[in-house]
A protein has these predicted regions:
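PAPS-dependent sulfotransferase catalytic core
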Residues: 1-64, 85, 91-92, 97-109, ...
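Short, motif-level signal for alpha-helix interfacial/capping segments enriched in acidic residues
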Residues: 1-2, 57-69, 221-228, 271
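A residue-level signal for conserved active-site and pocket-lining positions in enzyme catalytic cores
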Residues: 21, 84, 186, 198-199, ...
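Hydrophobic positions within alpha-helical membrane elements
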Residues: 26, 89, 216-219, 251
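The conserved 3'-phosphoadenosine-5'-phosphosulfate
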Residues: 40-41, 167-237, 265, 269-279
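PAPS-dependent sulfotransferase catalytic domain
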Residues: 46-80, 87-210
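A non-catalytic, amphipathic alpha-helix used as a structural packing/dimerization or gating element
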Residues: 193, 234, 238-252, 256
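Long, low-complexity C-terminal extensions of enzymes
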Residues: 249, 253-295
């Protein structure tokens, strides 16, 4: 964010990575904006809106990736929250697992159906796209942009089409460049500090505390109770393997925000000169992988 930009011209963009305390911050951020100022999109689908539609809103909050938010034709103030990658992955598993069977059947949620029917080991070993893309370095992929983790590597997507592959180094590089361009970033344990920094810029109501919402302890009519499954050596190994790059990005980000008092304001990142790898022999296009599951 440029220090010369009038805050009234800024769009607040909350890039909400699932199971990082984002429901809490969304609740408090949204109280500052009228419905007319608020983009209704809560998932990764900003590309379905026209530039004119995006221009009318000042608050964006959803499970976005770092590429699609660049379509917003305003000066941006970008906020995100990270979490220990293994904790986040387990939290996401139990969140999906807890959904009642009736709700899953009624809404046809494939990822929830698969999760509900199996074990944690089944979840971590699944190659179904609805599961695999969310278990393999998910935070890094979202922070890198419109990227999907596949069994053959990391696919870079543009306008719903695959345009190339990313190496591990390229994926991490894109994620870190984007993180360094964000205005406020922190850990799930720092929600109050994160809110305070955003509130100062946008003139929001100060809060004495920021209580967590949507936690596993919360009772909900659509949720079952759950019993944690034992973490066997095999599961532990899979958790480490599937979050390897997430852990690297998380630790590097932690070092940076602790050094800079959680404030990252180093100018806008620019990945437009980035050239992905061309299609490689032996690697299936994403469309073929999905088709093998009848998707």
């Amino acid at each position: 964010m440029s220090s010369q930009v009038d805050p009234s011209e800024l769009a607040l963009v909350f890039l909400h990575l699932p199971k990082t305390g984002g429901t809490t911050l969304h609740h408090h951020f949204s109280a500052h904006f009228t419905p007319e100022e608020t983009c209704p999109e809560r998932y990764s689908n900003l590309k379905s809106y026209s530039v004119d539609e995006l221009r009318q809103w000042r608050f964006f909050s959803g499970h976005f990736n770092a590429d699609e938010i660049r379509r917003i034709p305003r000066p941006l103030f970008v906020v995100t929250v990270l979490r220990d990658p293994i904790e986040r992955l387990l939290s996401n598993y139990y969140f999906w697992k807890r959904h009642k069977a009736d709700y899953i059947e009624e809404n046809g949620k494939v990822a929830l159906q698969i999760t509900k029917a199996g074990t944690l080991l089944d979840f971590l070993q699944s190659y179904n796209p609805h599961i695999f893309t969310t278990t393999v370095n998910f935070m890094t992929s979202r922070l890198a942009g419109d990227v999907l983790a596949t069994p053959d590597g990391y696919a870079l997507i543009q306008d719903y089409e695959q345009i190339g592959w990313l190496s591990d180094a390229q994926l991490v590089n894109r994620a870190l460049k984007n993180i360094l361009s964000f205005d406020v970033i922190g850990d799930i344990s720092q929600l109050a500090d994160i809110y305070a920094k955003v509130a100062e810029v946008f003139g929001m109501t100060p809060l004495t505390e920021v209580a967590r919402l949507n936690t596993k302890e919360d009772e909900h009519e659509l949720m079952d109770q759950y019993t944690p499954e034992p973490i066997t050596p095999e599961i532990s190994s899979l958790l480490e393997e599937k979050t390897r790059l997430d852990q690297l990005v998380y630790e590097l980000s932690r070092e940076h925000w602790h050094r800079d008092s959680h404030r990252l304001d180093v100018g806008e990142g620019n990945n437009r000169d980035f050239t992905p790898l061309s299609r490689e022999p032996g690697k299936r296009p994403v469309a073929d992988w999905y088709a093998s599951f009848g998707l």
